[in-house]
Amino acid sequence: NLVKYKYAGGLYPINAKREMIWGVTCYKDFASLPEKPDHVLVLVPARFAVQVIRDAAAAGARSATIVTSGFSELQDEESQRLAAELKQAIKETGLAVTGPNCLGNLSAGENLFTNIDDRIVTMEQGAVAIAGQSGAIVMAIRQALEDRGVGVGYMVTTGNESGLETPDLMSYFAADPSIRVIVVYLEGVRNTKVFRDACKAARAAGKPVI
């Protein structure tokens, strides 16, 4: 989708076994990249994700989306251990991270769509922002709005929320002048104060939270 919608920023796939992916040159590791990455999309097996986050931060990245599953959504000891290690790595590196176990994000104004959805997306900076833990439901909400001619400026799937949580996104959307309506899907609220503060920020900005 990054190629399909002609994202204008640099695209630097890291894959030691391939030279090209979708016509885009691959690099063997972070050290080989021609410039510092701004955002890293993590698609490696769970056992490698923690090191990728640390390597991304060392390479100068500021944020990451971890699509990889196999963490706290599973109950086995190894998955729980990896989840704890990932959370610690995010804390230590200071990266702004969505996921793991999520389905990517949309920033329409930037033609940035890191989701596997192959349905047509109108890349216009709409006035609605969506965030939530269930990627499938968030994607369904976006599609329902799209079908009704309602523009979606941002869509963020947060998954297990090892880093950023949905209320963090709500606060960001509340401060963004391009957004008029905030839609969220919550499976739970870990920090009720942060959630209340995000709701208050949206109310102060005159933006309904649905």
Show which residues each predicted segment covers.
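Catalytic-core regions of core metabolic enzymes
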Residues: N1-I210
